[in-house]
Amino acid sequence: MANTRAISSGAKPVMVLKVGGALLQCEMGMARLMEAAAKIIANGQPIIMVHGGGCLVDEQLKANGMTTKKLDGLRVTPQEQIPVIVGALAGTSNKTLQAAAIKAGVTSLGMSLADAGMMSAKVKDPQLGLVGEVEPKDASYLEFVLSKGWMPIVSSIAISEQGEMLNVNADQAATALAKLVSGSLVLLSDVSGVLDGKGQLISSLNRAQVNELTKIGVIEKGMKVKVEAALDVAESMGQAVQIASWRHAQQLIALSRGETVGTQIQPQIQ
């Protein structure tokens, strides 16, 4: 039985903030994001930051003479690539974000999905190799960290009960963490939200609309994974999930005040 609970400061739920994409290669973008995070935390809303680091993983794999393959938007992870992927995500990407947090005056703690029994993990699909699927398990470690006013920075690396290191899609990792702490989920990407066939921002979507846009190829690949993760949380927790851009970090402050930014993924209305 998962030990999940609502962790909040006052009336504000934890903001589970997923970052990744090109952000990790943009010092100014990271600086602005951490400045916004510092203000949100100072205003009484805790943040858990979850990250991927696909661009860095691709670079490191190429440097080691390895190729990247994706299946339906998810990275195929053969055993021989695990040391490179774990090093890029749990190592370099995690500490790059932590360095930006420290520079912005945010006290943070670098961790992975494997820490303190917060998640259970298993292989998602043998076709994907060592790609993990995680379920919320125990929130007590995160509860302690947040009670100190610290910001967890969580890499999307998990470990199974068999001791296998697993690469978890960061959007799916953020989904599990939002469920674990009953938090509000914000998925940041390189674009401003979900765009229609003409490149215009769609302000709100539910499952039926997502299915239609997926069928005609407007939502595909990485955005498809992101939207499906958002729908999972929206429907299981009965609350909207935001998909927005890290390029407009100040919008997060507006979001913490209850305003809408990017695309809202809505629970299906019965």
Swiss-Prot record:
Which reaction(s) does its UniProt entry say it catalyses? N-acetyl-L-glutamate + ATP = N-acetyl-L-glutamyl 5-phosphate + ADP
Which parts of the sequence are marked as the site Transition state stabilizer?
Answer: K18, K226
Key words of the record: Amino-acid biosynthesis, Arginine biosynthesis, ATP-binding, Cytoplasm, Kinase, Nucleotide-binding, Transferase
Which family does this protein fall into? Belongs to the acetylglutamate kinase family. ArgB subfamily.
Q: Which GO terms describe its molecular function?
A: acetylglutamate kinase activity; ATP binding
- Quote the function comment for this protein: Catalyzes the ATP-dependent phosphorylation of N-acetyl-L-glutamate.
Q: In which pathway does it act?
A: Amino-acid biosynthesis; L-arginine biosynthesis; N(2)-acetyl-L-ornithine from L-glutamate: step 2/4
GO annotation terms (biological process): arginine biosynthetic process via ornithine; L-arginine biosynthetic process
PANTHER family, alphabetically? Answer: N-ACETYLGLUTAMATE SYNTHASE (PTHR23342), N-ACETYLGLUTAMATE SYNTHASE, MITOCHONDRIAL (PTHR23342:SF0)
Xref: InterPro entries? AceGlu_kinase-like_sf (IPR036393), AcgluKinase_fam (IPR004662), ArgB (IPR037528), Asp/Glu/Uridylate_kinase (IPR001048)
Top-level lineage group: Bacteria
Provide GO CC annotations from the record: cytoplasm
Q: Which organism is it from?
A: Shewanella halifaxensis (strain HAW-EB4)
Q: Which Enzyme Commission numbers does its entry carry? A: 2.7.2.8
Q: Which cell locations does it reside in?
A: Cytoplasm
Coarsely, its chief localization is: cytoplasm
Top class in the EC scheme = transferase
Q: Which Gene3D superfamilies would you find in this protein's record?
A: Acetylglutamate kinase-like (3.40.1160.10)
Residues annotated as binding substrate are G53, G54, R75, N167
Claim: Ribonucleoprotein is one of the keywords in the record: no
NCBIfam families, sorted: argB
Entry protein name:
Acetylglutamate kinase
